[in-house]
């Protein structure tokens, strides 16, 4: 007997499952009876934000998802884009925020495991990873523990699995004190004629369980990921999954071998809501029913209930619909890799989701209403209140610009991330061309191919809070610029939208306007969103995180030998600014970090100018005019120049244009701007090309000496810059 299904369904139990009273009434109307305890858990898992996107789906539909290179957009395990020669890139970014705060090592590790499965489920071998991490104030007592655990968890899983980490972000702000963000990105390469989908087809076909055994870890994980935190965090620790990267590696190899056999009809990884979600999604997408027998599920713990088996989020598991004539050969492959292969059910034609356990039917529900017809809300929202423009003349000028620059370089958010990325294997697989620490990571498509892929992920949360619309646009354009600085053509993006409680109209307004900004930018730049993730309820005791819509993008280089980096400049190169001189100090780190001014609107994003300047930069890189390129973002011109000096270990001498106040020209964060180190013989050709294309270009100076010398108002040696840039993170992590 399933004793768990004898549990009385009370209002308290319904609330514990995160279901509103109107949602429960909808369930009663839908099935015409009271649900069993297991069914209640299934509805709770499938109708929460993490699985259903019920608060955001209306707005996600406005994103541009089509493009000339797009093979598969949102709705599958990951997005797919064509890169030519019969190959495609499969990629996605996904959050594991709540679990990583509760149990940082396992939360981050299993976040990596989940996104890796999303990619190789579709037939792609993972080739690159990134992560975007947001932590609380460095002064908060938990921050150092969380940083250490998350970084170790990501490295422990991705290094053992064998995928290089090529880029990412790490930022600190007190608004993440109670809710850190762990956004993980993975890209893989597949054959365009061998992509595997999750849509079940055919009646009476075997449904097969693949991979590791099912335990009690992660039960209720999807529900936990859709709730606010309070002071009872430790009680949620059992909802965090435990991962094993070595089993995942075996699962990858077994799945790819099985795919070569052409035995798979549909395949889905078991992620949020585990077996429930994978079975329901496969059936609902294919307009088929699914029948499961839980007695056939491999379990690693005794006396597991139907509720626990259905909602476990144990890692390294897949569900597949198999061609029956190939089941013996398929089973042999998984046996060879030491993994479980168990036929646990079949597809049906009745659009019902039926589950039996110990001879008893414990679930009998309509599958479409559970899956792709789950409730969708049009939540009330209010338009964000915008800050007035802050003129540079209104911002105090600090006389010692050298001290300002050194303070920024030695700050939590502008210092080197070497301490982080040196814990990741950045070179495994042998195709990494540009490692973390620059604008974008770059890998070769393969060791005998001239093509390369570039990756970047970006967002500026302080911009998004001041103006979610402009902040959403800026997240896209910075990612697009970073890819462009390598010479790669940006092809497509994935989003990871991290926000607070959508039931708060102010928070919902942030989400709505950020999506509007992202949509407009992606449309103008031909940079479609092909996959993504929404993480809501990132609040603790009513304190919401900064709105953080992370954008990760992929670009393509036809010839990797033409790749340029932030640190490639040579002596006697000309330093050239593409775009306007700095003037905008609103929401700049100069205003916030140096003057403690949280005022002004963020910089306006001119999308046509972004497109024009990005195309020009890629063109001059392809023509071989440029030794180094860097986009200008946080910290403006001064910080960008300092980073180039540090990476190249070469000095720069420049003069300011004096078109703006000096502090604005140095630290203004105007957009659509790049610094290029131009080869001496190519300078005139580049200037002529800029004139023909009506590109704003300013000659600033040259690569020379052993210091960063700006108009004699700032003169800092390479050693001094490097020491300040590299010292903050190790000192922070080694504090006793």
UniProtKB/Swiss-Prot annotation:
CDD domains reported for this sequence: PurL_repeat1, PurL_repeat2
Domain of life assignment: Bacteria
Pathway(s): Purine metabolism; IMP biosynthesis via de novo pathway; 5-amino-1-(5-phospho-D-ribosyl)imidazole from N(2)-formyl-N(1)-(5-phospho-D-ribosyl)glycinamide: step 1/2
UniProt subcellular location: Cytoplasm
Protein EC: 6.3.5.3
Active site annotation, chain numbering: 50, 96 (proton acceptor)
Catalysed transformations (reactions): N(2)-formyl-N(1)-(5-phospho-beta-D-ribosyl)glycinamide + L-glutamine + ATP + H2O = 2-formamido-N(1)-(5-O-phospho-beta-D-ribosyl)acetamidine + L-glutamate + ADP + phosphate + H(+)
Main location: cytoplasm
Residues the entry annotates as binding Mg(2+) 1: 94, 533
Transmembrane segments: none
Subunit structure, as described in the record: Monomer. Part of the FGAM synthase complex composed of 1 PurL, 1 PurQ and 2 PurS subunits.
Protein name as it appears in the record: Phosphoribosylformylglycinamidine synthase subunit PurL
GN (gene name): purL
């Amino acid at each position: 007997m399933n004793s768990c299904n004898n549990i009385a369904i009370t209002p308290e139990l319904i609330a514990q499952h995160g279901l509103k009273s109107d949602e429960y009434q909808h369930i009663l109307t839908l099935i015409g009876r009271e649900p069993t305890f297991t069914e209640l858990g299934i509805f709770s898992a499938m109708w929460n934000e993490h699985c259903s996107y019920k608060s955001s789906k209306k707005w996600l539909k406005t994103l541009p998802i089509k493009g000339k290179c797009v093979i598969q957009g949102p709705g599958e395990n990951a997005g797919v884009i064509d890169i030519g020669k019969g190959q495609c890139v499969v990629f996605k970014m996904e959050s594991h925020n709540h679990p990583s705060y509760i149990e940082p090592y396992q939360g981050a590790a299993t976040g990596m495991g989940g996104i890796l499965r999303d990619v190789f489920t579709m037939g792609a071998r993972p080739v690159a990873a990134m992560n975007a991490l947001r932590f609380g104030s460095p002064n908060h007592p938990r921050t150092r523990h969380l940083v250490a655990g998350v970084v170790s968890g990501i490295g422990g899983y991705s290094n053992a699995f064998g995928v290089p980490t090529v880029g990412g972000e790490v930022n600190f702000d007190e608004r993440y004190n109670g809710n850190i963000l762990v956004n993980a990105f993975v890209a893989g390469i597949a054959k365009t004629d061998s992509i595997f989908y999750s849509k079940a087809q055919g009646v009476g076909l075997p449904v097969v369980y693949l991979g590791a055994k099912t335990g009690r870890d992660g039960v209720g994980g999807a529900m936990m990921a859709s709730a606010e935190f309070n002071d009872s965090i430790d009680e949620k620790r059992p909802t965090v999954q435990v991962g094993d990267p070595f089993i995942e590696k075996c699962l990858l190899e077994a799945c790819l071998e099985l795919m070569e056999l052409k035995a798979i009809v549909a395949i889905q990884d078991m992620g949020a809501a585990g077996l429930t979600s994978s079975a329901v999604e496969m059936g609902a997408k294919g307009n088929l029913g699914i029948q499961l027998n839980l007695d056939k599920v491999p379990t690693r713990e005794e006396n597991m209930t139907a509720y626990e088996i259905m909602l476990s989020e144990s890692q390294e598991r897949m569900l597949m619909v198999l061609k029956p004539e190939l089941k013996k050969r398929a089973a042999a492959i998984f046996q060879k890799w030491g993994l479980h292969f168990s036929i646990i059910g079949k597809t049906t034609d009745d659009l019902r989701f039926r589950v039996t356990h110990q001879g008893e039917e414990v679930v009998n529900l309509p599958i479409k209403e559970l899956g792709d017809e789950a409730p969708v809300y049009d939540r009330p929202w209010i338009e964000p209140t915008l800050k007035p423009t802050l003129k540079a003349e209104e911002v105090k000028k600090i006389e010692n610009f050298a001290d300002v620059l050194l303070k920024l370089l030695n700050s939590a958010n502008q210092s080197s991330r070497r301490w982080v990325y040196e814990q990741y294997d950045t070179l495994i697989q042998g195709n990494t061309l540009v490692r973390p620490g620059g604008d974008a990571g770059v890998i070769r498509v393969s060791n005998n191919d001239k093509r390369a892929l570039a990756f970047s992920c970006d967002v500026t949360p302080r911009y998004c809070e001041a103006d979610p619309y402009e902040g959403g646009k800026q997240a896209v354009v910075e990612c697009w610029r970073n890819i462009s600085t390598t010479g790669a053509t940006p092809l497509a993006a994935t989003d990871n939208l991290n926000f607070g409680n959508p039931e708060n109209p102010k928070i919902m307004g942030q989400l709505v306007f950020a999506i509007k900004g992202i949509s407009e930018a992606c449309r103008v730049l031909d940079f479609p969103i092909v996959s993504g993730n929404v993480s809501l309820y990132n609040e603790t005791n009513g304190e919401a995180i900064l709105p953080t819509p992370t954008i990760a993008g992929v670009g393509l280089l036809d010839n990797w030998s033409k790749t340029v980096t932030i640190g490639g400049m040579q002596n006697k190169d000309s330093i050239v600014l593409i775009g306007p001189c700095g003037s905008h100090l609103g929401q700049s780190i100069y205003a916030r970090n140096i003057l403690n001014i949280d005022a002004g609107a963020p910089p306006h994003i001119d999308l046509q100018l972004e497109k024009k300047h990005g195309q020009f930069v890629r063109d001059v890189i392809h023509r071989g005019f440029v030794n180094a390129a860097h986009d200008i973002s946080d910290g403006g011109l001064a910080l960008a120049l300092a980073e180039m000096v540090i990476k190249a270990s070469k000095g720069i001498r420049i003069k300011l244009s004096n078109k703006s106040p000096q502090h604005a020209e140095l630290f203004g964060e105007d957009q659509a701007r790049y610094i290029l180190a131009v080869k001496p013989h190519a300078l005139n050709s580049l200037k002529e090309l800029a004139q023909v294309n009506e590109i704003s270009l300013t000659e600033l100076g040259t690569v020379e000496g052993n210091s960063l010398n700006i108009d004699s108002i700032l003169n800092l040696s390479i050693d001094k810059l490097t020491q300040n840039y590299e010292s903050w993170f190790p000192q922070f992590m080694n504090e006793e």
